[in-house]
């Protein structure tokens, strides 16, 4: 019998493919500023890094630049207005969630996305009433890789960290899970760039398709 009694997911790049809408917002902003759009295949690996990563890619700026904040505010508004334009569950996630629910294994979401973006996204995708918990980047005082959101999720779903699997597509996800003593799994199908050496993350496992997670349960 499996020791795992709950599965917790990162959101962008693990549970939901949000790169198309993040890319749409970035390219719309670029075109408004007179620049050419960026190909989707270049945007995708940055999609897990939020506005900082995407604006860095598109405009070659950092948060220290004077025009960063105005561009960030416009980017977020564009994304917010198009948050489920194309975003959808990754292939295989719908079946995985159904199988978890059919076997009474609670599942939840732990993301660094702020609540004002997380809530409409999960609600419009019909996940809000199904997830046992939804932890956003500003739900607790610290975000991933700090263990605080992980431990708070466990508290909400009445599970011990040692009995939880956390699956994500970024190094901070794996660090957060390990910091909370969870079993960690890398979603290699997510937003991982060619420069990421995921073996260095020292996760407990790697999957290339959501269905492979069932082997752990």
Predicted regions and their residues:
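Glycine-centered flexibility sites
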Residues: 13, 48-50, 92, 108, ...
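A generic structural signal for short
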Residues: 15, 84-85, 106-107, 138, ...
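Conserved SAM-binding loop
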Residues: 15, 89, 107-110, 142, ...
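Residue-level detector of anion-binding/catalytic polar loops
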Residues: 36, 106, 183
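Conserved short hydrophobic patches within well-ordered secondary structure
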Residues: 22, 47-48, 75-76, 110, ...
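N-terminal helical cap/lid subdomain that shapes the substrate entry/recognition surface
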Residues: 2-95, 101-103, 114-116, 127
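Asp-based, Mg2+/Mn2+-dependent phosphohydrolase catalytic module
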Residues: 1-5, 41, 101, 115, ...
């Amino acid at each position: 019998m499996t020791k795992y009694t709950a599965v917790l997911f990162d959101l962008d790049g693990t549970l939901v493919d949000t790169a198309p809408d993040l890319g749409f917002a970035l390219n719309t902003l670029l075109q408004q500023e007179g620049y050419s759009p960026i190909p989707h295949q270049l945007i995708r690996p940055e999609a897990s890094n939020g506005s900082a990563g995407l604006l860095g890619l598109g405009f070659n700026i950092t948060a220290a630049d004077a025009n960063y904040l105005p561009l960030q505010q416009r980017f977020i508004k564009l994304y917010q207005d198009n948050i489920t334009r194309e975003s959808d569950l990754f292939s295989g996630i719908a079946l995985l969630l159904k199988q978890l629910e059919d076997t009474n294994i609670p599942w939840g979401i732990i993301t660094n996305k702020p609540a004002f973006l997380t809530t409409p996204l999960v609600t419009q995708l019909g996940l809000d009433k199904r997830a046992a918990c939804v932890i956003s980047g500003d739900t607790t005082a610290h975000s991933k890789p700090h263990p605080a959101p992980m431990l708070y999720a466990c508290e909400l779903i009445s599970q011990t960290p040692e009995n939880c699997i956390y699956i994500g597509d970024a190094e901070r996800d794996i660090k957060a899970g390990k910091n909370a003593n969870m079993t960690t799994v890398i979603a290699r199908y997510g937003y991982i760039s060619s420069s990421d050496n995921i073996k260095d993350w020292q996760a407990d496992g790697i999957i290339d398709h959501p269905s492979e997670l069932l082997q752990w349960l």
